[in-house]
Every structure is written in structure tokens, then in C-alpha cells.
Regions:
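Hydrophobic packing residues within well-ordered alpha-helices of enzyme cores
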Residues: 61-65, 90, 116-117
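Short alpha-helix plus adjacent loop in nuclease-associated cores
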Residues: 82-94
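Non-DNA-binding regulatory cores of transcription-related proteins
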Residues: 96-105, 110-131
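Domain-level recognition of soluble alpha/beta enzyme cores
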Residues: 123-153
Length: 164
């Protein structure tokens, strides 16, 4: 069995004329990413794949997660083509992960990350900013990942973290 943690980047500011890829996290986005990192600290195992879109806001979100986990930023892998990547692109990349990894993590953008969770679980999902979906996958090799192979185990949102 494998587990996939799919995260949408934290809340970002308006573009104000800058390219969308360069948008940065707001103070709320930073705070939510740090909280999500603390929330998932006991779930994360050092060395598990952490693949991230190269957009500034996703990179910042992943760095805050690493900070909360007590991991070096070296833990994250910037996937050059992941900016606004489709669910199918994510499936291709995840399928290349080492089989020794029982779990893997991605930080990306909607609609791609929400579409990925939907494709894997056959359940409608729309991740809010700094939302996380945990997907349980019943296979031993990441290369076996395809539509319908997952079960949605949980959704975490910034609001749900406040309630607990």
C-alpha cells in the first residue's frame, strides 16, 4: 500500500502586473503552510518524495512545510513542468518515484491537483488554498498508479485545522 499527499499551495497575493508564476504567498498563506506542516509532522517521513511546482507560491509553501517538519529544503524537488500541470502529467511523474517510498507528497495548483485526487478516487474534490488530500493507494509499485486506484482517506483545510 502507498499513500499520496496532494497539497494545493497557500494563499497568494494578487499579481499586480507580475507574471502569475511569480506570485508570492500572503501572510495568511505563510501561516497556513506552517500550520499544515505542524499538522502533518508525524505523518511525514524524511526522504519521501516531495515534488513541487516551480511557481514562487508553491515553492514557498513547500519550504514552510519543510521548516515545520524540521527538514532541509534539499528535501524538495522542483518539477520544472509542474506549473499548472494536469492530473495526467502528475500521474506520469508520480509513476517514476522509487518503490521504497511508502508515501509521497506533491505541492501544486488547481485545477491539476484537485483533478488528480478526483481521477484517483472517483470522488469530486476541490482543494482550497493550503488544502491537503490524503489518498490511499493499493499497490506496491508507483508505476501502477492510474485512475481509480485510490481511496480518499481525508481532507485537511486551513479551516479544519482551526477546529481541532
Amino acid at each position: 500500500m502507498k499513500r499520496l499527499f496532494v497539497i494545493r499551495h497557500g494563499k497568494a497575493g494578487l499579481s499586480n502586473g507580475m507574471p502569475d508564476v511569480a506570485r508570492t504567498l500572503t501572510s495568511r498563506g505563510v501561516e497556513d503552510a506552517l500550520k499544515l506542516g505542524l499538522w502533518t509532522k508525524t505523518t511525514r517521513n524524511a526522504g519521501e518524495p516531495l515534488w513541487v511546482s516551480p511557481a514562487t507560491r508553491t515553492h514557498q509553501t513547500a519550504k514552510k512545510l519543510c521548516e515545520s517538519w524540521g527538514e532541509s529544503e534539499d528535501a524538495l524537488h522542483l518539477q520544472p513542468d509542474a506549473y499548472l500541470a494536469s492530473d495526467r502529467a502528475w500521474l506520469t511523474w508520480i509513476g517514476q518515484w522509487p518503490n521504497e517510498a511508502a508515501s509521497g507528497w506533491i505541492v501544486g495548483h488547481n485545477p491539476g491537483v484537485s483533478d488528480l485526487v478526483e481521477r484517483l478516487t472517483d470522488q469530486p474534490v476541490w482543494l482550497p488554498t493550503c488544502g491537503l488530500a490524503e489518498v490511499e493507494l493499493h499497490f506496491e509499485s508507483w508505476a501502477e498508479i492510474f485512475a481509480g486506484t485510490g481511496r480518499l482517506r481525508g481532507l485537511i483545510t486551513p479551516k479544519s485545522m482551526l477546529l481541532s
